[in-house]
């Protein structure tokens, strides 16, 4: 008897509400999820929850479980201490206050309320001349009911590893592990690009060192859900 395939769930979908990034209307996303028999979908639009209500309503109406999340630019307050070209470039970029993007998901009503608080803080906390971001200290105040993924190649741990700052990567992973405990997952992404391959083994080692789970993610910004599913299944 053939072994039944495990259900597949995309956790890193970006809709058209990911401004200047996503191109997938939520109504279309719901129809695709039904057509491809996905039991659930995770939405992680960048720095906002603009589509959370529409996403929840439309997916529930189609019998698909909505997983509400957000990708947040997070300032750990440590990136300017490092002197690699990656960090110096980051310090001079529009994302100067971002040490990388974390993906946070609401696991209950408290988590959703905290996501709302963080979404609001993204726009009210920075100075007028600063890009949209939040500080890790703010997340520490609002971590209840949230599950965290470390963000793939644009996450704070991977960015430190890209700059050969292994101690910085470990310190960030340690901080997140202390904050989220068993709700932290080190995210591995495989889009077939070198910067993912270079750090994958180090990410796996960090997950083991800090007793974090491991999650597979693919950043979906358009309609190619099925194509990416096949890539994972090999």
Range-by-range predicted roles:
Residues 1-234:
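Phosphodiester-processing cores and adjacent nucleic acid-binding clamps
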């Amino acid at each position: 008897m053939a072994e039944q395939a495990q259900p597949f769930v995309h956790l890193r979908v970006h809709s058209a509400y990911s401004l200047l990034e996503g191109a997938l209307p939520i109504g279309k996303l719901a129809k695709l999820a039904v057509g491809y028999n996905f039991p659930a979908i995770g939405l992680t639009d960048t720095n906002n929850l603009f589509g959370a209500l529409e996403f929840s309503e439309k997916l529930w109406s189609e019998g698909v479980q909505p997983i509400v999340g957000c990708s947040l630019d997070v300032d750990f307050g440590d990136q300017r201490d490092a002197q690699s070209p990656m960090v110096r470039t980051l310090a001079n970029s529009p994302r100067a206050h971002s040490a990388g993007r974390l993906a946070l998901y609401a696991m209950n009503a408290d988590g959703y309320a905290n996501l709302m608080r963080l979404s609001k803080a993204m726009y009210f906390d920075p100075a007028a001349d600063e890009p949209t971001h939040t500080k890790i200290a703010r997340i520490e105040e609002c971590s209840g009911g949230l599950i965290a993924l470390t963000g793939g190649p644009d996450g704070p741990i991977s960015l430190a590893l890209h700059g050969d700052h292994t101690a910085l990567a470990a310190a960030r992973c340690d901080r997140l592990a202390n904050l989220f405990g068993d709700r932290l997952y080190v995210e591995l992404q495989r889009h077939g690009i070198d910067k993912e391959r270079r750090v994958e083994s180090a990410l796996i080692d960090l997950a083991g060192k800090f007793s974090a789970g491991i999650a597979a993610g693919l950043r979906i910004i358009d309609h190619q859900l099925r194509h990416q599913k096949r890539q994972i299944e090999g």
